[in-house]
Structure formats: structure tokens, C-alpha cells
Amino acid sequence: MYYVSKRFEVSGAHYVTTDRRTKCEELHGHNWIVIVHCKSLTLNEDGMVTDFTVIKQNIMSRIDHKNLNEVLPFSPTAENIAKWICDETENCYKVEIWESENNKAVYEI
């Protein structure tokens, strides 16, 4: 089994509506740190599990410097964003996303 990881940063704004009133319901921004983990039993014709550039471009072009509530079809919590990134990335099995130094969400298949 081959394993690779790609780390990148994404800047964006969002708000999250909850049952209780919190500061997260106001539009605010993050500089997310994202690590995408991929695996494969075989390498593609280029000798890779997946192309790191394609991972970054596919995600960043859609959410970097955007209001995530306007561009994503779901509530943009860190957990939902992590799942979406994994679903959108070939051979992905795990995504880690930090909203801040102290807050991290992980989605793993």
C-alpha cells in the first residue's frame, strides 16, 4: 500500500447556525490548515498515488478566499468541509482540518 499526504492552507469565511446562540453564527474567517491523506495499492501511469497539484487546485479553486456558505451546498462546519474534501479527492481516506491551533476536525473513511 502506498500512502501520501498533502498539506495546504485555505482562507475563507463562514457562519454556522446552531440550536444555541454562539459567536459562530456571525460571519467570521479562518486560515484553515488542511491535510489530505490518500492511499492506493498501485501507482498511476505517472508513478503517483495522486497528483498533489490536482488536489490543491481542485479544492482551493472552489473555496479559497470565499464565503463558504455561498459556495458549498451544506452547513460549512469543519467536519462537513473535511468530508467534502475527502469525497472530492481521488484515493482519499482521511482529511484533517484545523480552524485554529486548538480546533481540529478529522474525517476518515
Model-derived regions, located:
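Charge-rich, low-complexity N-terminal segments
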Residues: 1-109
